[in-house]
Swiss-Prot record:
Residues 72-84 have a biased composition (Basic and acidic residues). This is Putative B3 domain-containing protein At4g03170. Residues 34-56 have a biased composition (Acidic residues). GO terms for molecular function: DNA binding. Residues 1-12 have a biased composition (Polar residues). Residues 137-245 bind DNA. Keywords: DNA-binding, Nucleus, Transcription, Transcription regulation.
Amino acid sequence: MANSTGKPTSSTQEDEEATSATEILAQLMQDIIDREEDIDDEDDIDDEVIDDEDYEVASLPLLQESQANQKQSREREEETEKNQPKRFKKQNMMKINIHDFSEETLRLIEVWYEAELDPQDIFGDNEVTRLFSRPIKKQLMSSDVDKDQCMLMLSKEQVKEKMLPFLEDSENPVKGIDVSVYGPDGKVQQMEFKMWNGDKTPVLTSGWKQFVEDYGLSMTCDFVTVWMFRHIKTRKLCFAIHYVKFSLRD
């Protein structure tokens, strides 16, 4: 339809634009179909098949970046482990200075570290609990036996995983918890279990110094195994500690 000037009406313009848009859309659809057919044809040619893994990485730059970061992380971990004895790399829970010990002693330390000691041996026939925590093993350092500080420092991650589940809601290690600590001969001493240096490091203190003196513990050569448990009768929070000495290199 035209107006008095002979120009197409707005309705005609809209029809033509709709027709043009339809034609463009149809052409785009045909182009897509043609490209898919080309891809199907290429898939039939063995030497032009795209490897799935390469395709995914090329299509996902974030994945490619993630893989690169993972590789860098593995390289950093390998670099960190270079100075650690091979036998301790898998556990990666207790690092020691290998230069302090002979190869024979390092093998003995490995056996000790992997062995599952029975804490009930400390108590003999006396039943104090039916459930011990999983043990924490560590080499005593200067901070553990220094007379000016003298507190047994424990791994925060291991305490969180192995020991904190034994605590009751009313027990707050940040404020400090009075505990009974059983030595390797079954003798008991009173100590405090608390978070030291803010809430960064779990420690046994307020009695640990006497424990060190009673058993003649020393840095480097002495290694301890520590369990937590709740006394079967008193329900009091307790620790059991066993230690072993290894000879230092001459």
